[in-house]
Regions:
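Tryptophan-anchored aromatic micro-motifs
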Residues: 154-158
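Sequence/structural signature of outer-membrane beta-barrel proteins
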Residues: 118-122, 159-163
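Extended lipid/amphipathic-ligand handling interfaces
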Residues: 1-3, 9-14, 19-41, 62-80, ...
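Short flexible loop/turn segments that cap and initiate beta-strands
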Residues: 148-152
Length: 188
């Protein structure tokens, strides 16, 4: 039935350019509060520079580049009002990993982003950017920042941020929201 999907899959292939697969299953799709679902995806993208021509003729088109090879993999899930996702993008020896979760019943959420030797210059070669190493964690509960019960925290550590051949890493940010009060600390 439309409400239950036992198994679904997708395969996209263009020799020399794209190899992408995804599969998943779901129950109670039409009721987000009861939905249970899981999905996985994996892609290998090569020699995709031809896509740059599809961008509007603008300053962005002249500044952006698509690396020769990009790998993408991840998962997503839903469990009766709780949603999660995890994804990793790899290229030119670097990686971005993203994980997140949201529980709509308890209004709890969290996200983690990691960049390990991620080559920003592979995407924006004209912007004097280099490698990026950082870790970001954020989480909390409650959606209204003015309510005293809402809590949140952010932790950011930038170990390396290259710009014009210099490293501007070594920056840390910690911020907390609790009891209607926001506090934070920035250090280098």
């Amino acid at each position: 039935t439309l409400g239950d999907i036992g198994k679904a899959g997708l395969d996209i292939s263009s020799p020399g350019h794209v190899a992408f697969t995804a599969d998943g299953a779901a129950r109670n799709v039409l009721d987000p509060g009861r939905m249970e679902a899981s999905a996985r995806f994996e892609g290998d993208f090569r020699d995709m520079a031809f896509l740059e021509a599809l961008l509007p003729d603008s300053a962005l088109r002249r500044r952006i580049a698509i690396p020769d090879r990009i790998r993408l993999r991840g998962t997503a899930g839903a469990d009766k009002g709780a949603f999660s996702a995890a994804s990793t993008l790899s290229t030119d020896g670097g990686e971005i990993a993203l994980q997140g979760r949201l529980d709509t019943r308890s209004e709890a959420y969290g996200i983690e982003l990691r960049c390990d030797s991620f080559p920003l210059n592979s995407f924006l070669p004209a912007d004097s950017l280099g490698l990026l190493d950082l870790a970001l964690q954020a989480g909390g509960s409650g959606f209204d920042p003015l309510r005293a019960q809402t809590r949140g925290n952010i932790r950011l550590q930038v170990d390396r941020a290259e710009f014009r051949g210099r490293d501007f890493g070594g920056v840390k940010l910690n911020a907390n929201l609790e009891g209607g009060q926001l506090s934070g600390r920035l250090s280098d």
